Design a protein with these regions (language model features):
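Solvent-exposed alpha-helices and their adjacent loops that cap or buttress functional pockets
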Residues: 3-5, 63, 152-156
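Active-site phosphate-binding/coordination module
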Residues: 26-135
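Non-catalytic pre-domain segments flanking phosphatase-related domains
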Residues: 1-14
């Protein structure tokens, strides 16, 4: 960056988890005040996160963000204070997600499948570890969680991505197989869960989401 250039000519983009949020997954009030002060003085600031709107907005509603926020790792570009989605990337086809689920289930991993219709939902059949249960507890609080016997979706729902939660040992071979088969079709993120470090997340979206 050229520090002789007016910083107000740049757009500053921050992540949430492991960056702005504290260890309890909250945005401290003193951080809200500092960021708002910078925005009020002309700073162009926004957020890019793997969270969806229902999860991100309660954390960010105190910020005076004027630019659209990037949600779900680039699946949605959204006006923060209205919730209006102004851009969508490509979604994952139903046939494709069926192939992925059939692979994942051979490893005895329970997937969460994200959809978007009129609302955001996360469908799952069950949980088999504390990391996944912790995630269910979180998404149940904002009514996204939908426990089902089989993965079936309405004609109005589009599949925005999927999530696997388990230990690194369990997920590493899943990641290797999916990345080998579908690296041109999927963006795959494999990392430690910042809130439950003994578990890892394998989260994936359409290749055009970034």
């Amino acid at each position: 960056m050229d520090f002789t250039t007016d910083p107000r000519k740049f757009l500053y983009v921050s992540d949430l988890d492991g960056t702005l949020l504290d260890g309890d997954g909250q945005l401290p009030e003193n951080s809200v005040q500092r960021i708002n002060r910078l925005i009020d003085h002309g700073l162009n600031f926004t957020i890019a996160t793997a969270r969806n709107y229902d999860s991100a907005y309660p954390l960010l509603k105190g910020l005076n963000i004027k630019h659209p926020v990037i949600l779900f790792n680039g699946v949605y570009l959204t006006e923060l204070h209205t919730g209006e989605n102004i851009f969508f990337s490509d979604f994952i086809s139903l046939d494709f997600i069926r192939k992925v689920v059939s692979i994942v289930e051979t490893y005895n991993v329970e997937p969460f499948i994200y959809t978007y219709g009129e609302e955001h939902f996360a469908y799952y059949k069950g949980v088999n570890n504390l990391g996944a249960q912790s995630y269910v507890d979180i998404i149940s609080s904002d009514k996204r969680a939908r426990k089902v016997d089989e993965f079936t979706f309405s004609e109005h729902e589009r599949i925005s991505g999927f999530l696997l939660i388990d230990t690194s040992k369990v997920l590493e071979p899943v990641y290797a197989e999916l990345n080998s088969l579908y690296k041109d079709e999927l963006n795959i993120y494999f990392a430690r869960d910042v809130s439950n470090p003994q578990f890892h997340w394998l989260q994936s979206f359409h290749q055009q989401a970034s």
